[in-house]
Design a protein with these regions (language model features):
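Acidic/glycine-enriched connector segments
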Residues: 5-7, 27, 34, 49-124, ...
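Glycine-/small-residue-rich active-site loops that bind phosphorylated ligands and cofactors
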Residues: 20-21, 43, 113
Length: 154
């Protein structure tokens, strides 16, 4: 049986990326959060610092909803502008919950953790948009199915 979302149900976007973002990268993530909130998306992220904190700040500026899935059981370590927090107490394993929660995943900057989240997203069939992050090419040199590169948040 296939689940069907009710008409008008919110769409979810998972935003992943650098936990230590440069000011430029944080500005892009904040702008992305603003744009997603303006369009009515619920934003899911890892709930901590860097890109996660910046995207939540952008969402809050525009009155949107953000959900942070934390790696630990301590809600006090969450980014301050999140609407809701989920304490997973799962460490890096929470990355699967972050990417599985979105209808699409947007990667902004990042290092090895972000690369692992991109792989997890594709393994569960989520489309991925790459914004100032890893350049990924399959062994045959072609395009990766379900992965697109973007130059700006717009």
């Amino acid at each position: 049986m296939t689940a069907v979302e009710p008409a008008g149900a919110p769409r979810y976007v998972s935003v992943i990326g650098a936990s230590r973002a440069t000011p430029e990268l944080a500005a892009k993530a904040e702008e992305l959060g603003e744009l997603l909130a303006e369009r009515g998306f619920v934003v899911v992220c890892g709930g901590r610092s860097g890109v996660m904190e910046a995207v939540a700040r952008g969402v809050k500026k525009k009155g949107g909803v953000s959900i942070g899935i934390l790696p630990e059981a301590d809600r006090l370590r969450a980014a301050p502008d999140l609407t809701y927090t989920v304490c997973s107490a799962m460490g890096y394993a929470r990355n699967l919950s972050v990417v599985a929660s979105g209808d699409v995943v947007i990667a902004v900057g990042g290092a090895w953790g972000t690369l692992s989240e991109i792989a997890l997203a594709r393994n569960v069939g989520k489309p991925v948009i790459l914004l100032d992050t890893w350049s990924i090419t399959p062994p045959d040199g072609g395009e990766l199915d379900g992965v697109r590169r973007a130059g700006t948040p717009v």
